[in-house]
Amino acid sequence: MAEPRMPRPAISPTRDKSHSPYRESPSRRLRDVETGYNPPQNPPYPPQRNGTEPYPPSPSSRTADWEPIMSNPNPMSQSDLGRKKSLIRPERNRIDRDHPNYYYRKHAANMEVLPSTTGNDPVVEDLAEHRTVSSGSTQQDTSIEEEVVGNPQKSRMPGKLEPVGKKKAPRKLVRKDTRNLTEEEKRRQKELDKIKPPSIWNIYCAVVTFWAPDCLLQCFGMPARAQRRAWKEKVGLISIILLIAAFVGFLTFGFTQAVCAAPGLRLKINHVDRSYMIFHGGAYNLDGSMHPAARGIPLDANVLYDLPHKYGGQDGSFMFQKVNGACKGLITLAEGSDVPTNSDGDLAWYFPCTAFNQDGSSEVNLTSPYYLGYACHTTAKARNTFYSLKKAGDVYFTWDDIKNKSRNLAVYSGSVVDLDLLKWFNKSQVAWPQQFDDLRENGRVRGMDLTHVLQSATDKQVGRCLTQIAKVGSIDTESVGCIASKVVLYVSLVFILAIVAAKFFLALAFQWFLARRFAAAKTSQTSDPKKRAKQIEDWTDDIYKPAPKITDPASTVTGSDGRTSKRGSMFLPQTSRFTSPYAVDRRSSRPPPTTMTSQSSNAKLLPGGNPYKSGFNSSQNTLDLHSRMSVGASRSSLLLSGQETRYSAVMDNLDPNGPVGFIHENVVPQPPPEWQPFGYPLAHVICLVTAYSEGEDGIRTTLDSIATTDYPNSHKAILVVCDGMIKGKGEAQSTPDIVLGMMGDFVIAPEDVQAFSYVAVSSGAKRHNMAKVYAGFYDYGPKSRIDPTKQQRVPMMVVVKCGTPDEATKSKPGNRGKRDSQIILMSFLQKVMFDERMTELEYEMFNGLWKVTGMSPDFYEMVLMVDADTKVFPDSLTHMVSAMVKDPEIMGLCGETKIANKNASWVSRIQVFEYFISHHLSKSFESVFGGVTCLPGCFCMYRIKSPKGGQNYWVPILANPDIVEHYSENVVDTLHKKNLLLLGEDRYLSTLMLKTFPKRKQVFVPQAVCKTTVPDEFKVLLSQRRRWINSTVHNLMELVLVRDLCGTFCFSMQFVVFIELIGTLVLPAAISFTFYLIILSIVKKPVPVIPLVLLALILGLPAILIVLTAHRWSYILWMGIYLLSLPIWNFVLPAYAFWKFDDFSWGETRKTAGEKTKKAGLEYEGEFDSSKITMKRWGDFERGKLDQRSSVCGILVETNLCHLFRTASSGERKCLEPATSYASTERLRFYAWVRTLP
């Protein structure tokens, strides 16, 4: 239970980093990234020691080989210890309550460490002996030891260094004294709370719901203020979802129409029919026109059909010439010209006023039929009539038309100019610049764009002039808006395809290459992956179907793994008579992974027979009679570390009922640390099962599966937390009675167990809760489905939340929710690791675990969380621990959950493929980056603490104060918090872990499998998915703000989380757009090919994933059923969940007897009275126990200690000599050993 300490920057002699078999943490550098700690460059004190006593070694070294820890094996200069070329300045970070390490720093500030000038590990100060402390031990402060043994020397020895940190009182229990607020201070605080300005979110919700005042909502059944606030926040969220959906719909369908409106009628050159006439590049429909009377034209004649010359389909631009515009000054009047002009030099026309063919085939005709200027329409009336005509459309040319060698065409600013029209100039009438002739006769200009050629001012005027007098059409181009819409379309297409393809291929790479690294080298199941997969599929057909028996001897833990054998092993000897029989895989020069047990290699085992010396015990540590007697005879801990422990001064003086003084006679002994049946060092695991209203069959199935896993029982313990005195619907017994009926060999008889107080996760008076702790062993029952030869003895502890006496008569006494059940364990682990004050309940949990396991709870490194209706495959726990041990950066993982009632109804059938794809696609993809965003609470594992830096240094993970503090939040006053903490607490824990430790990993281990029953009624599925979808949305909102996740910008987990959040919010809109697109492609032409291809890829890739990863073709059928049910998954369920944002109840999921569905999280009753809860450190509880007894086990309380001897005649123990002087640790251990003698 040692506090976590900083890692040493120098290389530890017991742990060579250069030969590590597993990936080293990138954060292993001088600065501890997770705590933000930086060693001081110039420490205020030089290192000093009292006396000449050397420093002790690490737990894995021998006593004779002790070397000073402060000695540096690799001397480094002072300059080498500083940070080099780093842009990170963690010391400049503002450490407020939002900082991920805020609470950890507060707890670490109470650590007493000495400064170091060498950069080595800080030394924990001990006033009795200068010893380092393993976090695997439980060290009690020396001041407590002095009080127990009566040592009057409590003053600090001269020359002792003051610990780094704050000035502390003489007592060792250092806490900030809580100061009672006066009435005036409370009043001021209330006033400050009242004048707190509203947030932007609250203002937005008030604006959106202005039409629904509080008085109106009260009339509609919302009397509570919390209900009205939740409803307004719900409307605010729905409005944002609608805005996002509208934006997505606009990008999908409206953006193209907005920026690229459908162009008007466009007529291709040479395809303009006889009902049109062309003027200046535009086509005019003159089919119903009537011309006034003129020479050669009768009244109301149609110029297209009624005249001798048929003008239909011809270009009449010369009849309405654009003169005196850009061409003024360029085209001038020729000498002797008959063209009318005025004083300003304006000309009446430039060309003969006649029509020509649109294909440019007309010959030049400079004559006029009646008079000069005939058909030039120079009068204002004629011009106004022409300008009033509506253009039917533009005449366009393609580039192929422009490059046609039969014509002399060029392009200027998008307009097509026919340079051959310049031949129609009459030299006798007008004069034009020579540049016109040069352009017309230059063959290199033909078919070119002259826009960038004519760049000077004069050239630009020439270009504009040509456009006015010789324009015959426009180039076939798209508008900027249309180009932009296509760019957006293709960029979106590439972007979506990249995400889908990356997700698919990375998930496939994880399944094929990366996942196998997590698995154990050998387990109790078959070593053939295909055969094992088939066994799992058969096993998941029924929830009560037992696991397959071991049929492959080569795959058992006692067999050899052929894949690990080497060809050269048959020629050269690999062992000798001096080789340890427990050593496993020592052929590699690389050190094994670090666990608490591997660091305690000098631990002393129980006296008597050791079942592990004879090889693997097929019954998984079930001892014979002789071994039981040996265990029962021992009255000390099974694992006594060679180091002095934090509790050594107290635990050696306990009474027979204390944690060390009494160990259950059926306790499972601890094997040697070298014993590695699965190819990796074993780690201790707590299997947490949270029970609420489950029935006897469900709980029995879960506990049977955990108890019969092939992981050694010496390294696992079952902890069941019953959430209140609850009776499930249709059950004859309450859940606590059902669970207690599955226990045996109680440490204390159930009727004698007392209820103890603790601080619950709730508000008001419900923060005080009481619970009972039952410790014993799992009982399979007389009608067990488990073969008696397979029944193993597993330590088990049950915590029953029974509630305070005030709520005994109320419904569901003691019920505080699943999060409170998890916090009971998490808070307990934090108190154990930091040696902090604990409640009476936590103290009893400490003693209960010690008595049924024979070891300190600080040895546990991992927590397996399983729901009480889930059944675990036998080797799943082995694979999960294997991943944790092999990669210390993994802080959480989950296995695959399979459905056991696939064919119960259509509701269960549509969920089969959804479960499959969520694991093998989503979680596999996220595991590549180590950022699985959701570890299902029904089957997951978290790391309690992780090795960090040098030997014996650990940092809290699940037991981290920041995790415990945030997860135990009891002020749940906003819609966001309620969806996080009341509906999706399991997912929020995963989110919290990623927020606090963004550089660590959460992965999916496909080898670990469990099965469960899913809802087979639609109303239950609707209620379950409402909770899941709403919690997913709010958890993704939390994660999207974490900037330290793996990757950068679009190639980061933060971006992936953002895409998932948007995708979740627009699910109803997306499925609606999909069906609209399919219908549109059927009834309208042309078919939108690109969106349909994209849709086919998104829906079809999972089928390929099934072929490549699944082991049954039946999943193709399940996929078809899932696709048919897409409207339910993507529309009905999300839309219902969004509308129920303000519903915080569990609905129809797990109802109890007589319960009515109601909204939760809205009412708080009474005030919390903290005086009802006693909190002390473990040593204070033990001293109090000693003070309550006059004489226990030969220890006199009046003298605190006495020398023990036994008489040879009667064998009874007798106190002969009180101890009045300081007793050494060895002497205390000797007395403890004497007390264990029969």
Curated annotation (Swiss-Prot):
One GO molecular-function entry: chitin synthase activity
Signal peptide: none
Catalytic activity as recorded in UniProt: [(1->4)-N-acetyl-beta-D-glucosaminyl](n) + UDP-N-acetyl-alpha-D-glucosamine = [(1->4)-N-acetyl-beta-D-glucosaminyl](n+1) + UDP + H(+)
Gene: CHS4
GO cellular component labels: cell septum; plasma membrane
Biased composition (Polar residues): 71-80, 133-142, 553-562
Activity regulation statement: Activity is stimulated by Mg(2+), and is more inhibited by polyoxin D than by nikkomycin.
Organism classification: Eukaryota, Fungi, Dikarya, Ascomycota, Pezizomycotina
Post-translational modifications: Maximal activity requires trypsin activation, suggesting a zymogenic nature.
Pfam families: Chitin_synth_2 (PF03142), CHS4 (PF22997)
Glycan-carrying positions: N50, N180, N365, N404, N426, N617, N903, N1030
Compositional bias (Basic and acidic residues): 14-34, 175-190
GO annotation, biological process: chitin biosynthetic process
CDD domains: Chitin_synth_C
Compartments where found: Cell membrane
Protein name in UniProt: Chitin synthase 4
pH effect summary: Optimum pH is 7.5.
Species, as recorded: Exophiala dermatitidis
